[in-house]
Amino acid sequence: IKKTVNHAENIMELGCHGVVFFGSTGQSQLISLSEKIQMINNLPSSHHKEKFIIGTGLNSLVDTINLMRISLSNKLNKFLIMPPAYYKYEDDDVINFYSKIIDALPESEIILYNFEKLSGYIFSIDCIEKLVSKFPKQIIGVKDSSYNLYKNLKINNFSVMPLSLIHI
């Protein structure tokens, strides 16, 4: 854990604008919930914690909210959240999923994770616009690993981050 935190701090010192813990490249699905909690409990000591983003990587709404609560109790309020995988979802289902999270934890800032190959769902521009309209302070950006949004999604004060190792 200490080496991971040190690595994150080092790349921040070199100019990185933020670090995601438990994203897909960080093998979130292979890290147990207890290991995630251990890591999260070690992050508040970093002087870069305001630039840390916690990827939830969980399909369960309850587990996602509980992990976010632990993060928030450690003064970590930015999250990368993918819609649950496995089942096929419509836009309204995805809006409902994020709405439940934000209703439970309104102090959170969320980056939507658009990665169809992992989740089975691809965000539409319409869905994102609805979420941002409904939650302008909480939905702050999208990581566009499916590359279907970055050219056409134009929302003020909203970040679009197109990148995936699949395309490198």
Walk through the language-model features, giving the residues of each.
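Internal, well-ordered alpha-helical segments in soluble enzyme and binding-protein domains
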Residues: 97, 101, 124-127, 135-138, ...
